[in-house]
From Swiss-Prot:
Lineage: Bacteria, Thermotogati, Thermotogota, Thermotogae, Petrotogales
Biological or metabolic pathway of the protein: Carbohydrate metabolism; D-ribose degradation; D-ribose 5-phosphate from beta-D-ribopyranose: step 1/2
Its job: Catalyzes the interconversion of beta-pyran and beta-furan forms of D-ribose.
Family: Belongs to the RbsD / FucU family. RbsD subfamily.
Gene name of this polypeptide: rbsD
Catalytic residue list: H20 (proton donor)
Name recorded for this polypeptide: D-ribose pyranase
Enzyme class: isomerase
């Protein structure tokens, strides 16, 4: 049995398969995941699991060189915005409009849907390299 890290076998597999510049999107409950996209639906209930905890677990195993968020998060969800800023204090944070974000996210290798129920709690993690 695995001792630590991500225990969800699908997420563990997808994270392990990420290459440099591949994108992974972590999204809220209401996000319109593209029809043909690969995704893992983690929603148990409203708020479970939440957006920030999901990011932290993925970061336990994924090297990230840049993140992309919707600029609307700063105005409409200051609490999660500030947490994202804190978590990624040493990483480039690119802000796009929500519509631009959705267009970029379509290129994600996979999506993780969380139980988050606050507006604009969506992020694209761009995979880095460990060397």
């Amino acid at each position: 049995m695995k001792k630590q890290g991500i225990f969800n076998s699908q997420i563990s597999y997808f994270v392990a398969s990420m290459g440099h510049k591949d994108m992974l999107s972590i999204v809220d409950m209401g996000y319109p995941i593209p029809k043909d996209a690969t995704f893992v639906d983690l929603v148990f209930d409203k708020g479970i699991p939440n957006f920030i905890d999901t990011i932290k677990m993925v970061l336990y195993e994924l090297e990230v060189e840049k993140v992309i968020i919707a600029g609307e998060m700063e105005v409409n969800n200051l609490k999660n915005y500030q947490k994202v800023i804190d978590i990624f204090s040493n990483i480039e944070i690119e802000k796009k409009s929500h519509e631009e974000f959705k267009d970029i996210a379509k290129n994600s290798k996979f999506f993780i849907r969380t139980g988050e129920c606050t507006p604009f709690s969506n992020i694209i993690l761009v995979s880095g390299v460990i060397f």
